[in-house]
A protein has these predicted regions:
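Alpha-solenoid HEAT/ARM repeat scaffold
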Residues: 9, 24-27, 61-64, 98-101, ...
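Alpha-helix N-cap/helix-start positions at coil->helix boundaries
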Residues: 20-21, 57-58, 94-95, 131-132, ...
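Structural signature of alpha-helical solenoid repeat scaffolds
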Residues: 31-32, 68, 105-106, 142-143, ...
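Alpha-solenoid helical repeat scaffolds
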Residues: 35-36, 72-76, 109-113, 146-150, ...
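Conserved small/polar residues in nucleotide/adenosyl-binding loops
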Residues: 1-5
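Eukaryotic acidic, Ser/Thr-rich intrinsically disordered low-complexity regions
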Residues: 156-184
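Short sequence/structural elements of tandem HEAT/ARM alpha-solenoid repeats
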Residues: 6, 39-47, 76-84, 113-121, ...
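HEAT/HEAT-like alpha-solenoid repeats
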Residues: 9-16, 20, 46-53, 83-90, ...
C-alpha cells in the first residue's frame, strides 16, 4: 500500500521533514518506490543524492541505498550521482559502507559494465575493519562475477585466501561464491 505510485509526491515532501527518522524513512521508501517506478521518483533523485554528504550517518546510509534501488531499475536516472557514491566506501560509519556495497550490487545487477575500473574500491572493503562490511564485500564480486567475470579474475587470489583463511565463516562462504561465479 505505501509503495503505491500515487504516494510518491507525498513521500518526496518528507525528505525535508523535521526529524531524522522521518527523513530516513522517506529515503528508504523512495528507494523502494523507485525500484518499481523509477521515472516517477526521478524528480527527487537530486535531493536524495544531496544526503550522500549529510552529517547524519543514517541519512547517508539511506540515501546511497535509495540510489542503488532506483539505479537497479534505471541506471540513467542516478548516473549523474553514481561516482559520488564511491566516497561512501571510506565513510567512518560501517553501516554507510555496508549500504554502499548493497547499492552497488543493486546497480551492478543490470548495469555491470560501469564497474570495471572501480574494482579496487571493493577489494579494499574485503579487509574492512567491520565484520558486516567484510561479510558483504565478496558479494559484489559474486554479482559482477556472474556478469563480468573478467572484472573479478584479478581478485581471485585474494578471494581464495579469504575463502580459506578468514576468521569469519560468512566471509569464507561468500568468497567461495564469488570465486564460483567468476569461474562459471
Amino acid at each position: 500500500m505505501y509503495k503505491r505510485q500515487e504516494n510518491i509526491p507525498y513521500v518526496g515532501t518528507l525528505l525535508h521533514a523535521q526529524t531524522v527518522k522521518i527523513t530516513a524513512k522517506a529515503l528508504w521508501l523512495l528507494g523502494e518506490m523507485g525500484l518499481a517506478y523509477p521515472q516517477e521518483v526521478k524528480e527527487f533523485v537530486p535531493s536524495i543524492a544531496a544526503f550522500l554528504k549529510h552529517e547524519e550517518a543514517l541519512l547517508r546510509e539511506r540515501a546511497v541505498n535509495a540510489l542503488g534501488r532506483i539505479g537497479r531499475a534505471e541506471y540513467e536516472i542516478i548516473r549523474p550521482f553514481w561516482q559520488d557514491m564511491f566516497s561512501l566506501s571510506e565513510d567512518s560509519a560501517a553501516n554507510v559502507r555496508l549500504n554502499f556495497i548493497w547499492a552497488s550490487e543493486n546497480i551492478a545487477t543490470n548495469t555491470p559494465d560501469i564497474y570495471g575500473e572501480y574494482m579496487d574500491t571493493f577489494a579494499k572493503l574485503l579487509t574492512d575493519s567491520d565484520d558486516r562490511v567484510r561479510m558483504e564485500a565478496p558479494e559484489i564480486f559474486r554479482v559482477l562475477g556472474k556478469r563480468k567475470p573478467d572484472f573479478v579474475r584479478p581478485y581471485l587470489e585474494k578471494l581464495t585466501y579469504l575463502s580459506e583463511n578468514d576468521n569469519n565463516r560468512v566471509v569464507r562462504i561468500h568468497s567461495v561464491g564469488a570465486i564460483k561465479a567468476a569461474q562459471a
